A protein has these predicted regions:
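C-terminal substrate-binding/cap subdomain adjacent to the FAD-binding core in PCMH-type
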Residues: 93, 111-216
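A short, structural micro-pattern
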Residues: 42, 80, 86, 108-110, ...
Length: 216
């Protein structure tokens, strides 16, 4: 069997593994390896990489990417990470956040229920109303509760525009930066601070919906 080198985000660890479609004891789920943190490595030489779900009618399976969801399915989501090929399973497992996290929260806000296979091979649908402990531990649990196979989303998802105005604010004191962030009410906000500078120079980029453009 062909082995693939699995590395951590910081490339400080690596291991050769065989990707399998069948979750087994000792394996661990792998998405597209876009986590900003150094995630877990499988105990043995196998890593589970789910490609398709054949046994359920869940529209959103764990191998779908943010690009599949947003671009192809036109779904608005909270807490969208900064890379388009992050998998849905990975976004749930790490409970991602995005440039909307000041008001939108994390990826957990999107999730209605999760279809999961436990280490004993039992398959469950867990939610805030059913098996809440497993549901809560799975979101942000990096797959340690079991294999995330799919999910469904809440009905009240955000609706985003195709057109935004960008504004840029600059300054050079932390006090001013914090006051500016506190009173921002934008859809997306990005901030950089130059910590190597004695002046603590900073930049804020804000994005808000452009209501003057006719939407297609």
């Amino acid at each position: 069997m062909n082995k693939t080198k699995l590395t951590s985000w910081g490339n400080n660890r690596e291991k050769e593994v065989v990707f399998t479609d069948i979750p087994e004891h000792g394996t661990i789920n792998v998405g597209n390896q876009n986590s900003y943190g150094d995630c877990f490595f499988p105990k043995n030489a196998n890593a589970f990489k789910n490609r398709e779900l054949q046994d359920i009618n869940y529209k959103f399976n764990s191998s779908m990417t943010m690009d599949d969801l947003i671009t192809k399915n036109r779904i608005g989501l909270y807490g969208v990470p900064g890379k388009r090929n992050v998998t849905l399973g990975g976004a749930i497992a790490s409970d991602t956040h995005g440039k909307d996290n000041i008001w939108g929260g994390s990826f957990a806000r999107n999730i209605k229920d999760i279809y999961i296979q436990l280490p004993n091979n039992e398959k469950l649908v867990v939610s805030r109303d059913k098996d809440f402990d497993i549901f809560q531990s799975t979101i942000g649990g990096y797959g340690l509760t079991g294999s995330i196979l799919g999910c469904s989303f809440i009905d009240d998802l955000p609706k985003y525009s195709n057109f935004y105005n960008k504004s840029i604010i600059t300054g050079n004191s932390l006090e001013e930066l914090l006051s500016k962030i506190k009173f921002q009410n934008k859809v997306f906000t990005v901030c950089w601070i130059d910590l190597l500078s004695n002046k603590k120079d900073w930049v804020i980029e804000n994005f808000e919906e452009n209501l003057n453009i006719n939407k297609p």
